[in-house]
């Protein structure tokens, strides 16, 4: 589910795995409201959230990374986060979080899984997926190549070809989209790999315009002429100046966890960035590691309240299978685990990898 959310589509795991789980629960006699199905359905959403911030070249991650570059440029010292290093940190944090949360569920929450003994593996084969057609194979191969063109410039920045790719990444994205709209390997329907009309109808325009508006607003609010950066620096510098670097990181992560589950995660990410930039730039601290962690954590931990993220809203909207009290109980537990892990694993790993 995490990898699917990262590289296929952020909502795909929930739309795919929840119906599969419903069928399995019905087949083996698990009732609504039992502990095991409640935890499993929430875990699918948690894994989806952990995969959501992974790709630095799309979605809210791209919006926040680009916004921070604009903020720091307005402050006189542009900070560009390395895409490959960011991706590595996000993947490691996601895998570790899933492993620890699953172990926590197994040995601490201990739901009754005895009915799983009645599961017939053949049931899962009743509706097999059809083989990939030419368009789907082309999409799979070309998408891997596209991801590499986005990440390799961060890994090999001194090569001239990589410098060319880095400067022209928007052109590459447009060219790749145009290629998908023109190529057709479908021998039956003769549709292009990317049917542009259908994609336009299904595109998340609301999220797109929200990201666009947030980036523009963030650049305006952090411009030197507004005085907001100077104000934040004046207010927060006395608070953070007495802290060690690690304690500064921990304080920011705790504040982020609280805010992202009250407000929208993207908005909170935008609000935290001027604070980080103001303090780090004035103190001579490399802000790339903590900024990367904040971006990953603010998007991944937004699970407790419906306003935190669309994924949290989907959890709370599943009234048929999930009760509000159970949702708050388990998501708060998982959020605390994620906080502990981002401090214990994320901080040292990001500090070592992101320069």
Residue map of PLM features:
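C-terminal transmembrane helix pair
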Residues: 86-94, 209-217, 221, 225, ...
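Membrane-interface segments at the starts/ends of alpha-helical transmembrane spans
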Residues: 75-89, 163, 238-242
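Alpha-helical transmembrane segments
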Residues: 27-39, 111-128, 187-196, 309-327
């Amino acid at each position: 589910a995490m990898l699917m959310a990262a590289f296929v589509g952020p909502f795909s795991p929930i739309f795919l795995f929840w119906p599969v789980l419903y069928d399995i629960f019905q087949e083996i006699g698990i009732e609504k409201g039992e502990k095991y199905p409640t935890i499993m359905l929430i875990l699918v959403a948690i894994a989806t959230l952990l995969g959501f911030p992974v790709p630095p070249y799309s979605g809210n991650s791209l919006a926040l990374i680009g916004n921070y570059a604009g903020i720091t440029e307005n402050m006189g010292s542009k900070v560009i986060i390395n895409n490959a290093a960011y991706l590595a940190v996000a993947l490691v944090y996601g895998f570790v979080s899933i492993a620890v949360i699953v172990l926590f569920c197994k040995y601490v929450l201990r739901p009754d899984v005895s009915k799983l003994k009645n599961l017939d593996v053949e049931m899962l084969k009743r509706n097999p997926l059809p083989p990939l057609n030419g368009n789907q194979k082309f999409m799979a191969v070309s998408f891997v190549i596209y991801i590499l063109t986005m990440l390799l410039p961060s890994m090999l920045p001194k090569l001239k070809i990589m410098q060319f790719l880095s400067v022209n990444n928007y052109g590459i994205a447009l060219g790749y989209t145009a290629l998908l709209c023109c190529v057709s390997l479908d021998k039956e329907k003769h549709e292009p790999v990317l049917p542009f009309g259908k994609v336009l109808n299904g595109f998340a325009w609301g999220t797109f315009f929200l990201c666009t508006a947030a980036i523009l607003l963030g650049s305006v609010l952090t411009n030197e002429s507004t005085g907001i950066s100077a104000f934040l620096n004046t207010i927060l510098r006395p608070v953070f100046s007495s802290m060690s670097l690690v304690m500064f990181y921990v304080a920011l992560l705790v504040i982020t966890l609280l805010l992202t589950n009250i407000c929208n995660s993207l908005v909170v990410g935008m609000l935290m960035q001027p604070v980080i930039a103001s303090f780090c730039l004035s103190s001579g601290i490399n802000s790339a590691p903590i900024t990367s962690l904040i971006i990953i954590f603010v998007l991944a931990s937004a699970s407790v309240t419906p306003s935190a993220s669309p994924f949290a809203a989907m959890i709370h909207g599943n009234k048929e299978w999930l009760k509000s009290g159970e949702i708050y109980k388990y998501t708060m537990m998982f959020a605390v685990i994620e906080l502990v892990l981002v401090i214990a694993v994320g901080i040292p790993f990001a500090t070592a990898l992101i320069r």
